[in-house]
Amino acid sequence: RGGAISCPGVRTATIQGQVHDEKCYYAMGGISGHAGLFSNATELAKLASVMLTGGYGENRYFSRNVMDAFTAPKKEDAANWGLGWWREGDNQRCWYFGTQAPSNTIGHQGWTGTLTMIDPVENLVVVYLTNKINSPVTDKAANPNNFNGNWYTASTLGFVAQLLYLE
C-alpha cells in the first residue's frame, strides 16, 4: 500500500504467490475462500473446467447433484450467492459477468484484479488475471486502498465478459 500502512509484521514487498488479504494471511494461515482464488491461469482454468463439467480429463470429481449443491442459490432472496461461488442470479453481478451472462453463470473475483467465470449455457470458462493492486497508491493520505490500477480499463472486470458476449 505504498508504505501508507506500517506496523510490525505487515508485508511491505510486492506480494506474489500468496494471498494479499491481510485478514486471511495473518488470521487464517493464508487459506480462506473469501480472499479470492490464487493460482496461475492454467490451474484456475482446470478448476473452472471441473466446476463446469464435474471433472477434468478422464477424472470425475463431482456428481451432478454435488455440482448443483455448489451452484444453487443459497437463499431465496439472494439468487446471486452459491456455495463458495458468486452467481449472476438476479443480474446483481453484471459488473463482473457483464449484462449478457445467463443467470446460472458462476464465478469468483479477487481484490487484486482477478476474475474466474463459468457459463454452463455457453460451455464457457474465462480466467482473467490483472495486477491492478501492484500499482502506486493514488493518494496515501486520503485512502491507502485506492490504487492507480483501479482506474485502468483492465480492472473493470465486467468488460471482459461483455466483449465475449457481443455478436
Q: Predicted segment positions?
A:
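Short, surface-exposed loop or secondary-structure junction motifs
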Residues: 1-103
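A structural signal for well-ordered alpha-helical segments within the folded catalytic domains
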Residues: 41-45, 120-121, 154-158, 162
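Short, gly/Ser/Thr-rich active-site loops of penicillin-recognizing serine hydrolases
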Residues: 53-56, 65-66, 71-79, 90-93, ...
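Residue-level detector of beta-strand structural context in well-folded domains
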Residues: 83, 114-116
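Short, structured beta-strand/loop micro-motifs enriched in basic residues and often containing a Trp
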Residues: 107
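Short, small/polar residue-rich loop motifs at catalytic or cofactor-binding pockets
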Residues: 110-112
